Amino acid sequence: MYTFKIGIPAEVHDTFVKNHPLCNLLQSSSWAKVKDNWGSEIVGVYEKDTLVASSLVLIKPLPAGFTMLYTPRGPVMDYTNERLVSYFMAELKKFGKKKRALFIKMDPAVHYQDFHLGEEHQPHAEATAIVETLKKAGAKYQGLTMDMGATIQPRFQANIYREDFSEEQLSKSTKKMIKTAEKKGVVV
């Protein structure tokens, strides 16, 4: 039995997000402070006394008293649990109606593909299944658009993993900027 809750305490939400495989900075409660021109609320789903899904929801005022809701890189939950996804989405829609939202945007931190430059890449089968689960729950999938205006966050993310990184790879100007920052007290 699931229970949807509005007003999850920030520390409870942050602990849940930090310990979840889909952890993302944009789902931290602190992100709401960065987006201080939007309202915010933390919502979640409990199964008995255990938080099983949570999301920072940003609320942007629109003309005529309407809003739009946005869950940056969220909601954070087990997307392989169709019952949970369906319940969360239904409750999020009800929450949106209370907030007079015209629409809800979301872009969960589900990796569609992961690859190193030059490697062949295929979509993750689980990501494709997650898209189908979300569609069954009523989400409208925007597809793999290349139009930057169609999404709020960039679709592509380039990473340099710690195990693949060495300072020798950096350009001379980057090394100089790092040294300058360190002299000014920035920890790099």
Protein language model regions, located:
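Short alpha-helical segments and helix-capping/turn motifs at coil-helix boundaries
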Residues: S28-S29, Y87-L92, Y141-L144
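Short, basic/aromatic recognition patches
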Residues: P21-W38
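Short, polar loop/linker segments at the starts of domains and inter-domain junctions
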Residues: T15-C23, Y87
